């Protein structure tokens, strides 16, 4: 009798509004940012084993249940496994319009469709919601022996409800 309630995807936010969902991926981070017409994943959580990661065990089932059939963007803040472990499963499981990261040039994620490095000053608007990349600076990519956390893609998201700072 209650099964139909479980099969209905939640309504999308109105124009200008944002829904942020922080997913429980254990140690690590994964955030779904949803506007009226767009979906972005910020970090993809950890890899648990060679065959299991937060992408195939948590994010893909969640996104399918939420009615998301494609991602407009996928941002990996830095190369630590607790932030990037589920990314390749996401890319295999859903169409992704573009990707961004601060990954080193030899990282496989850099081969993803429409990949671009995160750079301070990048900005875009989706459905009245403003997204602004605040870090890293272009010169940060040239620093030798940089620490991964110091390269984190920092994203500010502003909507009618207020702003959120995602630091990775």
Residue ranges: model-predicted function:
Residues 1-168:
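Non-globular, low-confidence helical/coil segments that flank catalytic cores
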């Amino acid at each position: 009798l209650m099964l139909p309630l479980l099969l209905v995807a939640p309504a999308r936010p109105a124009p200008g509004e944002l829904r942020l969902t922080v997913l429980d991926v254990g140690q690590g981070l994964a955030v779904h940012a949803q506007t009226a017409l767009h979906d972005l994943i910020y970090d993809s959580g950890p890899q648990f084993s060679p065959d299991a990661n937060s992408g195939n065990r948590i994010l893909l089932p969640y996104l399918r249940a939420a009615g998301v059939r494609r991602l407009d963007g996928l941002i990996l803040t830095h190369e630590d496994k607790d932030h990037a472990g589920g990314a390749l499963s996401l890319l295999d499981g859903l169409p992704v319009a573009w990707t961004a990261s601060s990954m080193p040039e030899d990282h496989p994620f850099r081969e993803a469709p429409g990949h671009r490095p995160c750079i301070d000053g990048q900005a875009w608007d989706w459905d009245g919601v403003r997204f602004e990349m605040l870090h890293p600076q272009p010169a940060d990519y040239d620093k030798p022996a940089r620490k991964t956390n110091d390269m984190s893609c920092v994203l500010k998201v502003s909507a009618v409800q207020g702003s959120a700072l995602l630091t990775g």
